[in-house]
Amino acid sequence: MPIATPEVYNEMLDRAKAGKFAYPAINVTSSQTLHAALRGFAEAESDGIVQISTGGAEFLGGQHNKDMVTGAVALAEFAHIVAEKYDVTVALHTDHCPKDKLDGYVRPLIAVSEERVKAGRNPLFQSHMWDGSAETLADNLSIAQELLARARAARIILEVEITPTGGEEDGVSHEINDSLYTTVDDAVRTVEALGLGEKGRYLLAASFGNVHGVYKPGNVVLRPELLKELNEGIASKYGQPAGSKPFDFVFHGGSGSTAEEIATALENGVVKMNIDTDTQYAFTRPVVDHMFRNYDGVLKVDGEVGNKKTYDPRTWGKLAEAGMAARVVEACGHLRSAGQKIK
């Protein structure tokens, strides 16, 4: 299927909220990990989101130049072509972008889509993330207002993170403490600045104890029920009916989450869940297994010539793709998006 148009992307998000499921947002760093994500979505019969972080884009730009925009645009254009061969609909997104990288990443990418839209085409990416969690909320929302206005004109959705997610993601790090919980006051200030859709659609990465990276169960206290409090607080203040879900929430830092925590988040308006750490492991684990099992073929040991079939990147690359795709299928099951593809 083609990459989602702006209209289809909005439909995807509306369907997720109404159906109480969420789309896995899979970080990719190469054409191979892109295919793994697309394959996983197709096998699960789930639509989904593929995203590129600043670090991923830099890697894609090549180690000689490390140009983030070049890397992101190149993989996005590639995705627009290869996605046609998969019977699911996928949206393209850029992940965490802090203030010091806006001018080298998100702003130029919005400009690319602005030019495409002026020419009567669809935007290259369907959404971009502004991560202002390291800034004061006032500065965060001020920049978000500027980006939201540009995104709306380019038919793009903006994702904002208003309070910190713990751990580290591509150089953006926060301590694990009480600041990891968004308050109703934070939500009110967000709506005052960004509106409730009339200024452009945005996704909200609210914090309810989330932590990026790897952690053991019990080390982090997630409170997904907090999302209900945020929705209720805004619905009450703005005269919306009881049970309204004014926000499109994003779940960051979900590695190690329990099924119950994920279910509670879905019930309260989460429509997108970022997955990176787990799929990185799922991609790499089969490669390690292959290398250990074929050590004397992969390396030229004791004067031998090795075995080309074992060190051919396609041999172990196929295993990596299959491993990551299987983890994407698992994620679709956890998030209830499996079998929910747009017909």
Swiss-Prot record:
InterPro entries: Aldolase_TIM, FBA_II, Fruct_bisP_bact. One of its GO terms (cellular component) is cytosol. It comes from the Bacteria. It catalyses: beta-D-fructose 1,6-bisphosphate = D-glyceraldehyde 3-phosphate + dihydroxyacetone phosphate. D-glyceraldehyde 3-phosphate binds at residue 53. Its EC number is 4.1.2.13. Keywords: Glycolysis, Lyase, Metal-binding, Zinc. Zn(2+) 1 binds at residues 96, 212, 252. Dihydroxyacetone phosphate binds at residues 213, 253-255, 274-277. Zn(2+) 2 binds at residues 131, 161. Binds 2 Zn(2+) ions per subunit. One is catalytic and the other provides a structural contribution. PANTHER family: FRUCTOSE-BISPHOSPHATE ALDOLASE, FRUCTOSE-BISPHOSPHATE ALDOLASE CLASS 2. Catalyzes the aldol condensation of dihydroxyacetone phosphate (DHAP or glycerone-phosphate) with glyceraldehyde 3-phosphate (G3P) to form fructose 1,6-bisphosphate (FBP) in gluconeogenesis and the reverse reaction in glycolysis. This is Fructose-bisphosphate aldolase. It comes from Streptomyces coelicolor (strain ATCC BAA-471 / A3(2) / M145).
